[in-house]
């Protein structure tokens, strides 16, 4: 399960499936598949814990998300939000249960830091020549960005800040 979690995290952070040159070459959605593989390993794991206070809060948030769409008259929006938010809930459950030892937490932190270093190297190249190896240009002519969820320079900066020890 832990290896699948690390591969999923690599796909979330490095995002090779979102590189413009590679978008059409991946036939299958790698990131959701890797999350499902990690979840299957978690299902067969003997240690499942749901006693952390974050679980009821997450469930409450999920319910409010659905009910708010229903009360706004858009029941289809509730169904759409299940599809968008369910992977977030699943990733939380898998990671919360899979990171049960200090050594695993340190390895995941190392993956975060190494991925941030890769994205920083991309930003350096992007700043020097105007475009990074992903094919993404500078945002607003001066701000580095990456692909996918890090297309917003502020989100990319938050990753960098989160990885500072």
Named regions from a protein language model:
Residues 36-41, 86-93:
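Alpha-helical transmembrane segments and their membrane-interface exit regions
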Residues 22, 75, 81-82, 126, ...:
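Active-site-proximal flexible loops/turns
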């Amino acid at each position: 399960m832990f290896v699948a979690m690390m591969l999923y995290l690599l796909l979330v952070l490095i995002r090779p499936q979102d590189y413009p040159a590679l978008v059409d070459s991946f036939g299958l959605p790698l990131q959701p598949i890797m999350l499902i593989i990690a979840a299957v390993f978690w299902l067969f794991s003997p240690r499942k814990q749901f006693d952390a206070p974050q679980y009821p809060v997450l469930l409450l948030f999920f319910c409010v998300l659905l009910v708010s769409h229903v009360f706004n008259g858009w029941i289809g929006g509730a169904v759409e939000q299940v599809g968008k938010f369910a992977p977030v809930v699943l990733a939380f459950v898998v990671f919360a249960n899979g990171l049960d030892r200090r050594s695993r937490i340190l390895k995941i932190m190392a993956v975060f830091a190494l991925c941030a270093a890769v994205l920083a190297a991309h930003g350096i190249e992007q700043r020097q020549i105007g475009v990074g190896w992903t094919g993404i240009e500078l945002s607003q002519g001066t701000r580095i960005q990456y692909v996918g969820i890090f297309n917003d320079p502020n989100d990319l900066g938050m990753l960098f800040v989160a990885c500072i020890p």
